[in-house]
């Protein structure tokens, strides 16, 4: 009530002028709409006092319920998938796979979504994109939001050069800059991108700094000719400015040090303009601020005050999802996450992941390793119960306590290093069927595990990547202990997706090897298996070495490749349906003790499927037919999944 009275004063509601009253009601409606209340009913009554020439105004406000988003529709996006655009905008719909999504409708959020979409299109080379939004109000107090998109033509980088009019560069610097520009233009994809312009600008800046040039600015100038864009980097010397004071505003919850550790400067340091964008990007990457503004206040004599104003955002989230499928059965996921725990910038996450054959409980926290660095340190407790009774005649409970560091090695390459303390408890479910090494390990086994991981990805968003590459490498070392033989395990995963017109071609390969450090048998759960998602037409643990149907052994070496062709069979569909045709190949071999059934032979399958991104989540149906198999393999020619995105790729 107090806030509404304040608005009446601001709007000068001091008499019974009908226009003033109408304006006041209109403004109150706008305020309610900004909070998602679009079904507000406002009426008023007058009580006039002739003796004093005054009156009382009584407003009756029926707020109603918050308006919800029913559907989000994209029209005209012929070259960028709905899922990619959906991942960019803040407006969300509620589905079975994200039942805790905030689907409140707010006009200003939709207006910001248009800005985000335009920015995304420009960054992907579409400089002429025009986006209009239409809101359909339903009688159920829900809305359908339609984004009408005219993508326009895609622009390409044509010529990139630089200008050194003040001759501050030497021959060595010139050669280095020319080399990185040449590498940039030799790329396969030269679509215009603001991010790529800034990245190349940063690379040039790094060359200058590494060669002892500290005070400069680089202006990125653009010249457009038809659909070709020429870029010129103008390199100029500047007089250094020194930071007298750094002021931080708006962080009512977040501690100052969380912001200061992301800054590239301290009081007394020289500062130049390119640093301001980098500081803003580093603060934005924390994912705890809605808006960031940095202003230089010039004090004269080459001194400046740096004013950083942030607007904090909600950093806590609840997630939940359900899925059902042939491989995992009924699965449920629930989690809590806070990205700014008590204003420290630390993230805390609790996750429960259960399925028919697996229950997993995880508690994890992540923070910066040291002040003024980009390395994150994490601590994790994990407990997993796995049921291998049908495949290998044992159950396995694993308790893990671990810590690790992670950081960006390059803009799209992440590196992580983890060390874990594992307690494994093997429980034999069938003594006559379980393998000898599993029976010998029955009970608790203790080990230390060191993991080293590299990850590179240019894949787009969505339940099915359209374009891009993924390369990952994992090296795992288990130290020998009194209850563990120890091993070295290496896994390389390669994925390539290419979109040609409406067709999507992909090839995915996984290569693995594990070696015992004591020349002993590797435990079954540490070996590689073949079947299921990576070899369709075969059951999980369906192909490869085994003693019996319920005693799968696995192998020390793995090579598997998936070839896929997908095509959207309905144009302009809000929920895309894709036809998929595939051909899989897999080979699993080598064990110290030869299993009863093991011939080291190649397995292969072909098949087709339907992938449907439905209102309740992704749905996949697959029919696989083995071409090359063995009599002892376990086939599964039909697979389905509802709600599991990972299963589709």
Task: Give the residues covered by each predicted segment.
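Outer-envelope beta-barrel architecture signal
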Residues: 304, 314-318, 330, 344-348, ...
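Solvent-exposed loop/turn segments connecting transmembrane beta-strands
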Residues: 299-300, 323-331, 350-361, 388-396, ...
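Periplasmic polypeptide-binding modules associated with outer-membrane biogenesis and secretion
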Residues: 1-326, 335, 349-364, 369, ...
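C-terminal outer-membrane beta-barrel translocator/porin domains of Gram-negative envelope proteins
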Residues: 285, 325, 432-577, 581-585, ...
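Outer-membrane beta-barrel channels and translocator barrels
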Residues: 289, 313-315, 327, 341-343, ...
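Feature captures outer-membrane beta-barrel proteins of Gram-negative bacteria and organelles
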Residues: 332-340, 359-371, 377-379, 399-409, ...
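Transmembrane beta-strand segments that form the barrel wall of outer-membrane beta-barrel proteins
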Residues: 263, 315-326, 332-355, 363, ...
């Amino acid at each position: 009530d107090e806030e509404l009275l304040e608005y009446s004063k601001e709007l000068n509601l001091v008499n019974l002028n009908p226009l003033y009253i109408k304006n006041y009601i209109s403004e109150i409606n706008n305020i309610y709409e900004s909070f998602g209340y679009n079904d507000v009913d406002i009426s008023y009554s007058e009580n006039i006092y002739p003796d004093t020439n005054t009156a009382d105004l009584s407003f009756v406000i029926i707020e109603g319920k918050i308006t919800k988003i029913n559907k989000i529709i994209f029209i005209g996006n012929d070259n960028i998938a709905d899922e990619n655009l959906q991942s960019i905008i803040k407006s969300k719909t509620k589905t079975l796979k994200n039942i805790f999504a905030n689907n409140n409708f707010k006009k200003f959020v939709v207006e910001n979504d248009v800005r985000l979409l335009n920015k995304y299109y420009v960054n992907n080379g579409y400089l002429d994109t025009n986006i209009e939004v239409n809101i359909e109000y339903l009688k159920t107090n829900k809305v359908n939001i339609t984004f009408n998109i005219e993508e326009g033509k895609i622009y390409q980088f044509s010529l990139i050069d630089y200008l050194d009019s003040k001759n501050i560069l030497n021959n060595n610097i010139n050669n280095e800059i020319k080399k990185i520009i040449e590498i940039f233009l030799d790329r396969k994809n030269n679509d215009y991108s603001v991010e790529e312009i800034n990245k190349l600008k940063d690379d040039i800046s790094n060359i200058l700094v590494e060669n002892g040039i500290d005070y400069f600015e680089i202006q990125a100038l653009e010249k457009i000719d038809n659909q070709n864009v020429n870029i010129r980097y103008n390199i100029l010397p500047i007089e250094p400015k020194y930071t007298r004071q750094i002021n931080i505003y708006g962080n009512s919850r977040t501690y100052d040090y969380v912001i200061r550790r992301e800054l590239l400067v301290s009081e007394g340091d020289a500062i130049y303009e390119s640093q301001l964008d980098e500081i803003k990007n580093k603060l934005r990457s924390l994912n705890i601020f809605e808006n960031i503004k940095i202003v230089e206040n010039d004090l004269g004599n080459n001194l400046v005050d740096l004013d950083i104003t942030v607007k904090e955002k909600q950093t806590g989230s609840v997630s939940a999802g359900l899925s059902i499928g042939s491989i995992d059965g009924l699965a449920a996921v629930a989690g809590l996450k806070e990205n700014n725990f008590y204003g420290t910038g630390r993230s805390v996450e609790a996750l429960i992941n259960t399925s028919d054959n697996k229950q997993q409980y995880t508690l994890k926290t992540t923070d910066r390793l040291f002040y003024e660095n980009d390395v994150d340190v994490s601590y994790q407790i994990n407990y997993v119960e796995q049921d291998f009774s049908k495949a290998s005649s044992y159950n396995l409970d694993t308790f893990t306590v671990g810590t690790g560091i992670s950081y960006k090695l390059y803009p799209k390459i992440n590196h992580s290093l983890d060390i874990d303390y594992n307690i494994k408890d093997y429980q034999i479910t069938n003594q006559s069927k379980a393998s000898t090494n599993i029976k010998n390990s029955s009970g608790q086994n203790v080990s230390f595990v060191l993991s080293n991981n590299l990850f590179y990805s240019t894949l787009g968003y969505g339940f099915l990547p359209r374009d891009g590459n993924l390369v990952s490498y994992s090296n795992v070392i288990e130290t020998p202990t009194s209850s563990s033989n120890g091993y070295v395990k290496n896994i390389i995963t390669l994925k390539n997706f290419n979109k040609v017109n409406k067709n999507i071609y992909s090839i995915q390969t996984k290569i693995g090897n594990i070696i015992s450090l004591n020349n002993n048998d590797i435990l079954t759960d540490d070996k590689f298996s073949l079947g299921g998602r990576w070899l369709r037409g075969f059951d999980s643990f369906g192909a490869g070495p085994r003693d019996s149907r319920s005693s799968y052994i696995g192998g020390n070496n793995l090579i598997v490749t998936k070839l896929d062709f997908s095509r959207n069979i309905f144009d302009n569909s809000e929920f895309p349906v894709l036809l998929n045709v595939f051909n899989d190949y897999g080979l699993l071999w080598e064990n110290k003790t030869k299993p009863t059934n093991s011939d080291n032979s190649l397995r292969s399958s072909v098949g087709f499927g339907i992938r449907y991104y439905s209102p309740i989540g992704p749905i996949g149906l697959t029919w696989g037919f083995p071409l090359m198999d063995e009599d002892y393999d376990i086939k599964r020619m039909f697979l389905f999944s509802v709600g599991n995105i990972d299963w589709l790729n």
